[in-house]
């Protein structure tokens, strides 16, 4: 415990012009969420913050709209003019005055881990100022860390202001620091903009404080991946690749077999049982729970769903906000839409769409069917081409099918309608009324045959010789 009040301050006022986007840089997506959302979540997971605040400028309204649902308690501070990172922090002076420590971070550092931020805050609580650094093989574009003879940080020199010797330094400023209130309030007003950019650099705070004899602790990351930011699309893709590899390692730790670890995308949280096998080009979104022994074949997309043990999801199937039971068989090319529950042993075959339906135990919808707003009992066979006609142009209506029902191919069930236990529906029927239990229902017209029928013949075309 710190026994101190802590403000988490995120600087998100920059335009990010190199992204060539109509959105601010902070809203560029990593792992299905804006970069800034990853950082805010990591800050919260430290369990050390009293409040969070975001300094915004460019397209601030869009930033607030994107984050307000997941981060409703964040304070918003507007930077009226884009005068640099030092000026951005100065904009939050009223909030800084209310907290013992302020944790400051740039919005485009989505891979920082909560444990790293915890360590930085504890160091700042002890020394008054702690700054996060990393060793980079290619430090181009980053501010370089300068140490004094005591080992403390005495300056940060930005790339555009660095001399040749300083540019050879590989230890860089990550863009995360924690500073006690007294020093921020004392030294922020002393920042100057005598640099190549004509801006007030937050990094200049280091030299001002060190010059007065204060020790500034540097905390160097074990993995430089946490320090990665993104100023353009190529760097954004590199961030996504590191994020994906983190998620892959989480799956390995759960005992999942990935046929090709480089060809999976995970945008969310995956909770997997033992002996799960995932083939290439699978996309997992939101919260996905996968039981023991499940196989997910290539090309599938699963979002916010639960898959029971020993189920197989065949190739190119899409499952969205649904629950699949144990030992089920789904696909290939099946689409399972929200509010669908498929019981144990259910079989949903190729080119079948299920929406807001309950499919009973060991029931089968094998081919080329649409089942919407329906409740199907146990051990039902739904023939190829069966459609539940659930929409009348104004409202949706339900279809109820009992246990042990057999529905022939190319059948239309016009809702609202009920097919009771044990009934059989003849192929090609259009069912508009309820069907009693253990009966055969069919609406097939009588077969008509015309003898000696000849199909119309095409007329031969004669070429014009002229």
From Swiss-Prot:
Swiss-Prot/TrEMBL cofactor(s): Mg(2+)
Any one GO cellular component localisation term in the record: membrane
Keywords from the named record: Acyltransferase, Cell shape, Cell wall biogenesis/degradation, Cytoplasm, Magnesium, Metal-binding, Multifunctional enzyme, Nucleotidyltransferase, Peptidoglycan synthesis, Repeat, Transferase
Region (Linker) location: 234-254
Catalytic activity: alpha-D-glucosamine 1-phosphate + acetyl-CoA = N-acetyl-alpha-D-glucosamine 1-phosphate + CoA + H(+); N-acetyl-alpha-D-glucosamine 1-phosphate + UTP + H(+) = UDP-N-acetyl-alpha-D-glucosamine + diphosphate
Subcellular location as annotated: Cytoplasm
EC numbers for this chain: 2.7.7.23, 2.3.1.157
Protein name as annotated: Bifunctional protein GlmU
Residue numbers binding Mg(2+): 108, 231
Family: In the N-terminal section; belongs to the N-acetylglucosamine-1-phosphate uridyltransferase family.
Gene Ontology terms describing biological process: cell morphogenesis; cell wall organization; lipid A biosynthetic process; peptidoglycan biosynthetic process; regulation of cell shape; UDP-N-acetylglucosamine biosynthetic process
Annotated positions binding UDP-N-acetyl-alpha-D-glucosamine: 11-14, 25, 79, 84-85, 143, 158, 173, 231, 337, 355, 370, 381
Lineage, top ranks: Bacteria, Pseudomonadati, Pseudomonadota, Gammaproteobacteria, Cardiobacteriales
Pathway: Nucleotide-sugar biosynthesis; UDP-N-acetyl-alpha-D-glucosamine biosynthesis; N-acetyl-alpha-D-glucosamine 1-phosphate from alpha-D-glucosamine 6-phosphate (route II): step 2/2; Nucleotide-sugar biosynthesis; UDP-N-acetyl-alpha-D-glucosamine biosynthesis; UDP-N-acetyl-alpha-D-glucosamine from N-acetyl-alpha-D-glucosamine 1-phosphate: step 1/1; Bacterial outer membrane biogenesis; LPS lipid A biosynthesis
Chain's gene name: glmU
Single Gene Ontology MF annotation: magnesium ion binding
Protein purpose: Catalyzes the last two sequential reactions in the de novo biosynthetic pathway for UDP-N-acetylglucosamine (UDP-GlcNAc). The C-terminal domain catalyzes the transfer of acetyl group from acetyl coenzyme A to glucosamine-1-phosphate (GlcN-1-P) to produce N-acetylglucosamine-1-phosphate (GlcNAc-1-P), which is converted into UDP-GlcNAc by the transfer of uridine 5-monophosphate (from uridine 5-triphosphate), a reaction catalyzed by the N-terminal domain.
